[in-house]
Design a protein with these regions (language model features):
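Conserved helicase RecA-like core
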Residues: 1-216
Length: 216
């Protein structure tokens, strides 16, 4: 948003750039930033006249569609992610009926020595539903997903970082790149479909030599 403001105020010109880098394209898509990125792309030279690099952890149909729009004769490079889990994280699994999952989550939040906990769900609607339930029941909770305006999202992230709220609910894409000290627990309310997403999730705890707990 700030870059667009500078361009529109004639403080910055993008029409002569040679390189355009679009990082975390899937996250930009999930967080609702693509309209802003499209405006920036329109300010830059045509794709045939610039070199564009686009990075993404996942390549959904929507991400590939963006690549077709923005890249000229692209070369694809795929890197296999490391799938090892952190030995400092204790991993637990509870077999429970779907109808009992929320009750079990409440027991975990009550009984575990939680400093901060990140709860992951696969879809934005699941994040919203879980957030509404926990907030209704009096928990100090924030959520991170693409449906939230950026200013509110940053405010919620600050509340989690400074400990004002000790529960964060997030999707995989929205939670990527979030590094918060003092996360003692990670809860997979819904298990991810990809193993590397699982590794990434539980990597939010057990950092810098500390012990962590992952519960699925």
């Amino acid at each position: 948003g700030r870059l667009i403001d500078f361009v529109e105020q004639k403080e910055v010109w993008l029409d002569q750039i040679e390189f355009l880098v679009i990082d975390e394209a899937d996250r930009l898509l999930d967080m609702g930033f693509i309209p802003s990125v499209k405006r920036i792309v329109r300010f830059s030279p045509r794709k045939e006249q610039r070199q564009t690099l686009m990075f993404s952890a996942t390549f959904s149909y929507d991400v590939l569609n963006l690549a077709q729009q923005w890249l000229f004769e692209p070369v694809t490079v795929e890197i296999e992610p490391e799938k090892k889990t952190n030995a400092d994280v204790e991993q637990r699994v509870y077999m429970v009926a779907k109808a009992d999952k929320y009750k079990l989550l409440q027991e975990i939040l009550r009984d575990e020595p939680i400093e901060k906990v990140m709860i992951f769900a696969n879809r934005r609607d699941q994040v919203r539903k879980l957030y509404d339930h926990l907030k209704r029941d009096g928990y100090k909770v924030v959520m991170l997903s693409g449906e939230i305006a950026q200013d509110k999202r940053l405010k919620m992230l600050d509340q989690f970082k400074n400990g004002k709220h000790n529960i964060m609910i997030a999707t995989d894409v929205a939670g990527r790149g979030i590094h918060v000290d003092g996360v003692s627990h990670v809860v997979n309310f819904t298990l991810p479909e990809q193993s590397d997403d699982y590794v990434h999730r539980i990597g939010r705890t057990g950092r810098a030599g500390t012990r962590g707990v992952s519960i699925s």
